[in-house]
């Protein structure tokens, strides 16, 4: 009995010794965690700095404009760009099925002629992946090669990622709508802003991970059975 215990002690000491396999595994695991934390933190700092420094480009031009719904300012900005000739047609992607073209026209104070000829309403998208798939179909239908993308600056990186994944042959030009909370130079001391930034970064990382693994990526489109009244895209008259 005593001899068995004496024999077991060296075996345990061998596992936990400075060069034992368990110690090597623990050290390797800790090192891996430190590296991953460093990569994650560095990525977040890059993301936050990039988002906070985004500005609308001067002289932007494209074949057409796409705006991803989510706020009045985005749509108003996109309609203004269409009015200014930045693109010759506008897709409003992710419109609520209960919202009409007339309601959006009145909200943005756009002209009836412009909305009738040049504004298409996308009703199928329910998330950013859906926006990208809805946009890719619209781009193919119109044979466009360059698109000005209008969305919130928090949302721009993930939007461009999904759009380029769905339509890799298209050139996408970012036209961010600047959030008021990021217009201030000291946004990084405001917990709510940092929380939003971190949340968007996590969603951006998840989107990249889905593309790498192919796991958990749906089409993001509203099913016809769920809403028979919602057309795929309500096209303006040519």
PLM features: residue spans?
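N-terminal type II signal-anchor transmembrane helix
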Residues: 13-55
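A transmembrane-helix-recognition feature enriched in membrane-embedded lipid enzymes
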Residues: 190, 194-220
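Structural signature of transmembrane alpha-helix termini at the membrane-water interface
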Residues: 42-49, 78, 205, 209-212
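Short linear elements at protein peripheries
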Residues: 62, 214-238
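N-terminal intrinsically disordered, acidic low-complexity segments at the extreme N-terminus
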Residues: 1-12
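A structural signal for short, hydrophobic/glycine-enriched beta-strand patches
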Residues: 2, 48-191, 198
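Short alpha-helical segments used as structural interaction elements across diverse proteins
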Residues: 20-24, 71, 200
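Coil-to-alpha-helix initiation sites in intrinsically disordered, low-complexity, charged segments
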Residues: 13-16, 20, 185-186, 192, ...
């Amino acid at each position: 009995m005593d001899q068995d215990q004496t024999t077991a002690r060296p075996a345990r000491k061998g596992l936990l010794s400075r060069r034992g396999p368990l110690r090597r595994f623990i050290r390797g695991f800790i090192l891996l965690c430190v590296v991953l934390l460093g990569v994650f933190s560095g990525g977040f700092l890059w993301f936050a700095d990039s988002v906070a420094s985004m500005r609308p480009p001067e002289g932007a031009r494209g074949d057409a404009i796409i705006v991803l719904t989510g706020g009045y300012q985005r749509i108003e900005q996109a309609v203004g760009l269409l009015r200014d000739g930045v693109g010759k047609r506008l897709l409003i992607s992710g419109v609520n099925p209960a919202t009409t073209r007339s309601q959006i026209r009145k909200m943005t104070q756009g002209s009836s002629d412009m909305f009738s000829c040049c504004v298409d309403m996308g009703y199928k998208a329910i998330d950013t992946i859906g926006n990208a798939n809805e946009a890719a179909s619209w781009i193919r239908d119109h044979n466009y090669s360059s698109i000005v993308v209008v969305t919130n600056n928090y949302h721009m990186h993930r939007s461009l990622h999904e759009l380029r994944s769905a339509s890799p042959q298209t050139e996408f030009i970012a036209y961010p709508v600047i959030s008021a909370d990021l217009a201030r130079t000291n946004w990084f001391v405001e917990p709510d802003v940092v929380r939003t930034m971190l949340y968007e970064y996590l969603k951006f990382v998840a989107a990249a991970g889905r593309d790498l693994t192919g796991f958990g990526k749906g089409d993001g489109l509203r099913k016809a059975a769920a809403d028979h009244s919602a057309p795929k895209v309500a096209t303006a008259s040519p």
